[in-house]
Structure formats: C-alpha cells, structure tokens
C-alpha cells in the first residue's frame, strides 16, 4: 500500500528548540514521502545533516531551497556564495538521494496519483510591492521605515548574477521550460509563495518584496496542478486559489510555533491522507 505525501518547511534548526523537533519527524508508513520546502537552516553542514537524516527515514525526500540555505554567514566554514552555494547543496542532496529542483521530478504513485512532485526554485524580484510603492527602491524605503528589511540584503549574495532579481529571472525562465514539458498532474513546491495573495496575511506588509515574484502568478493555472506547497511566511494554513489548494507548511521560529500551543509542529498531509 502506498504511503502519504507529507510536507514541512522552515525548520530553522539553528534554534535548539527546532533542532529538537527533528527526532519526531518520522514516517507513519515506510512508503511516506516528505517534501522539505526550504529554510532548513543557515549553516551548510546543518542542512546536509538534516536532509540526510530525513532521507534515512522516509521513502523519498524532496527539497527546494529557501533564502536561509543561500545565506553566507561568517561562522560557516563553507564560504560559497550565490549559485555556487546552491549547486553545492544540490550535490549534497544527491549524495543522499534527496530530489532537488535540478533533478527529474519524482512521481508519487499513491491513491491520488500518479502525480509529479515538482520542486521549484524561483527566488524573488521585489515585485510584491506593498501599498505606497511601485518600485524596488520605494519598497525598500518603506521596509526600512517599518524596520523589517530582510537579512537577505546582507547575507544572500546573487553571484555570478548582478542582482537577486536577475538570478530570479533566470530561474523563472528555466523553471517555466521544465513545467511546460510536464505530462502529469503536479504538486508544485516552492519556498516562496507563487502568488502575492498569501502575503496579504503578513503582520508587516512591508516585508512582501522578499516573498516572491509576479512572474509565477499564472503557473498554477497554466499546468495540471494537483496542489501547491510553500513556506517562508511562517503562517501555516491552507487556502484555495482558482480551485487549487495552496498549503503553507512552515514550522517557523520557536516563539511562533510555541505561541500556537498544542503539540510540536508536524508535517502536513498533501496527498494520500
């Protein structure tokens, strides 16, 4: 019997409380698949350790990067920046059989399948502007006023691209080609939301410029999409757009998930539940 397709994101294992959650991330069925939609942590070795651990437990693990994996922090002995850092993370994933946006899409054969599981890496280009801004410069000014400038501005380097938005546009173009070749229904997996609508729930709307790109807004309509999984916002919930379920599956920081009360955060069932 096929297992379930589960999803989680924003584990942020740099926090001891979050790292302690790793032991509880185990399948209930040996055939369960797990999506990890970015922000495992910031330190290169931590990301590899977590993904290797999960790959040893689940039948299949699918990962796509968040912004935190792409940071280059002074304490990290791996000083790779930008695309080189991402490519090195992909190599680590392949060593443990974890699927990435650079691999052939895995096909889930559960009761709702076959369904392609498509991890996407599109980044952002500052086009999710808050009210009162129409340009990147205006959006950044509003974020500075609100005190919510994303740490990406300091730690996420776009090398060899001239800017994060240039890297984003290259990723969007490459991803669009891959999606156009899909011949199965797919679950789209992105760290950043594919639509602007989910960012309307942000406590600080000035943070939206770091949350995606308007270039991905039509992907869920242009393809046979069985569901969309994302993280980044630290607002776990399910919403519906154009008849398709969008699951935000983040754990978030300890102060966030502890405030929600109840049991420790668990992966969301996407298919097969």
Task: Map each language-model feature to its residues.
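Binuclear metal-dependent phosphoesterase catalytic core
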Residues: 2, 96, 200-202, 206-209, ...
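N-terminal active-site segment of His-dependent metallophosphoesterases
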Residues: 1-63, 69-74, 273
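Active-site neighborhood of phospho(di)ester-bond hydrolases with catalytic His/Asp-centered motifs
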Residues: 7-9, 34-39, 62-67, 100-104, ...
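Active-site-proximal loop/helix segment associated with metal-binding centers of metalloenzymes
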Residues: 118-187, 194-203
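Short amphipathic alpha-helices and their capping/turn segments at secondary-structure boundaries
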Residues: 49-55, 100-101, 106-114, 135-136, ...
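Metal-dependent catalytic neighborhoods of phosphoester/phosphodiester hydrolases
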Residues: 17-21, 40-56, 68-96, 109-112, ...
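Hydrophobic alpha-helical segments and helix pairs
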Residues: 83-147
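Beta-strand-turn-beta hairpins that frame and shape the catalytic cleft
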Residues: 1-6, 105-119, 240-245
């Amino acid at each position: 019997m096929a297992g379930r397709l589960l999803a989680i994101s924003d584990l942020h294992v740099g926090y001891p409380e979050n790292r302690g959650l790793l032991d509880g991330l185990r399948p209930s069925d040996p055939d369960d698949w797990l999506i990890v939609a970015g922000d495992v942590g910031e330190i290169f070795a931590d990301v590899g350790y977590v993904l290797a651990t999960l790959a040893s437990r689940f039948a299949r693990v699918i990962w796509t990067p968040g912004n935190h994996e792409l940071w280059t922090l002074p304490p990290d002995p791996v000083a790779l920046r930008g695309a080189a850092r991402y490519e090195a993370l992909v190599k680590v994933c392949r060593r443990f059989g974890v699927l990435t946006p650079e691999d052939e899409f895995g096909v889930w054969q559960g009761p709702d399948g076959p369904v392609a599981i498509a991890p996407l890496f599109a980044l952002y280009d500052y086009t999710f502007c808050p009210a009162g801004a129409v340009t990147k410069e205006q959006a950044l000014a509003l974020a500075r006023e609100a005190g919510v400038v994303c740490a990406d501005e300091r730690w996420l380097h776009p090398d060899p691209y001239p800017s994060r938005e240039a890297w984003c546009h290259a990723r969007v173009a490459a991803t669009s080609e891959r999606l156009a070749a899909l011949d199965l229904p797919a679950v789209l997996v992105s760290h950043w939301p594919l639509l602007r609508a989910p960012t309307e729930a942000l406590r600080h709307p000035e943070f939206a410029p770091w949350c995606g790109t308007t270039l991905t807004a039509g992907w869920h309509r242009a393809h046979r999409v069985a569901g969309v999984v994302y993280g980044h916002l630290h607002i776990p919930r399910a919403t519906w757009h154009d008849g398709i379920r969008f699951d935000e599956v983040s754990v978030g920081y300890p102060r966030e998930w502890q405030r929600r009360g109840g049991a420790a955060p668990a992966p969301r069932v996407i298919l097969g539940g």
